[in-house]
Amino acid sequence: MPMSSLPAAILSHMTAINNVPPPPLHSIPNLKKSKHINYGQLNALCHIRGQHSRSMSNILSAHDTFMKQYPKVFLHQKPRLPKLFKQEEQRELNEGKEESQHQQPDDSNNIAVHVQRAHGGHILYRPKRATEKFEEFLAILKKLPIHRTPYEHKTVWKFLKTIPDLTFQLNDKHLKTLSKTVFSETWLKGSTVVANDGFYVILKGLARPQTNVYKNLIEGSDSPDSFISQSFHSFIWSEEFKNSTLAEMYLPSYDSMLSKWSTFGTLEVMPQNESETQMFSVVTEDDCEILKIPAKGYAKIKEEKIKLENMQKLKLIRMCPYYEEWPTLSIYELIALLKWKKFPPGHVIVESGNIISFVGYINSGCCNIYRSIIGFVKLRSNKVKRSQKLVYMGKLKEKESFGEISVLLQVPFTCTIITKKEVEMAIIEDKDLFVA
């Protein structure tokens, strides 16, 4: 049976296709990694556990993890700021130098500058930055101490360390504590500042002393809380004129004027009856900014220091073996007599055969104990010579005491005590013990 034309055409086409060779193989092009994708995070994201779990809780946990990790897949480039040209930068520096040179006056012929420097005062002409810092200092003092930041407390402390009348009498620790309590007061021209309740530092303006109990600080004072000024224009209350019949109110001359950084007042807390009779005051010649350190605040700091020292002494004596069962009241009687003292390494505290002059309680360090013995040394001539030597017997350690029997019974020491390294101890001198 003859085939139709259509099937024959299809058959011939299929035969022709089978005879045609397959097309050549081509390699798959490499994929370029994107610079904006973190492929390590992407790989971790694709292998999160629980994505294909049948448990609903696992699926939700995997979904939360996926959503948290997803933003890490994309890299965020940091924005780059345009570079500055060196020429412009150099030009700005040169302009700044020229301006500072023009602004700073020539003080070579200014006698006031040399006088100020000779008395240890502040230089009259300061860079612009110092002026800005001083204005910042004034603004901080206007705040209540409780509202100041740690940075502001540190700024006040740094300025207090530049005032000679304060650093002469107060250590750095006291100044740091006081810096958190000081404040500034504004006084109008013609005001009378009564300074019986604190120590004052003039920050702006002029003031004139007006009192019958002033004494120039450059002459000194025996009072433990008074200040010996390094500046001529500083005055302080003096006990020497307390009962003086020659004392009278007066206004000093212009040479005694108190200016910037001048100090006056006292850190002693005066009794009420004395503060009423002994007026300690200045009169402002301008509108003044005056820093005040309250005497009561300083007294509180001293009380806290004494309490801490007494607690340290009590703890030291309590830890010494012979005082563990002593009543507290008896120990407090000893605390009133204790003084701190340091000894360098190799210092002979007491020699054998001598009576020691104090009772010691070792707070830090240690001492070696030696016994003096007589030995015999054979010489080349077959003769024997007597020789005295120190033999090590032991040591005194921290939280141990010595010298009680020698001081109380006036018995000589049978050994020699030498410090091995620096030793700090609390001591009671024999003269204080016998008086007590």
UniProtKB/Swiss-Prot annotation:
The superkingdom of the source organism is Eukaryota
Region annotation Disordered: where it falls in the sequence: 89-108
Q: Which SUPFAM superfamilies match?
A: cAMP-binding domain-like
Task: State where a nucleoside 3',5'-cyclic phosphate binds.
Answer: 322-436
One protein family per Pfam:
cNMP_binding
Q: Where is the composition biased (Basic and acidic residues)?
A: 89-105
Output this protein's name: Cyclic nucleotide-binding domain-containing protein 1
Source species, please?
Answer: Homo sapiens
Q: What is the lineage of its organism?
A: Eukaryota, Metazoa, Chordata, Craniata, Vertebrata
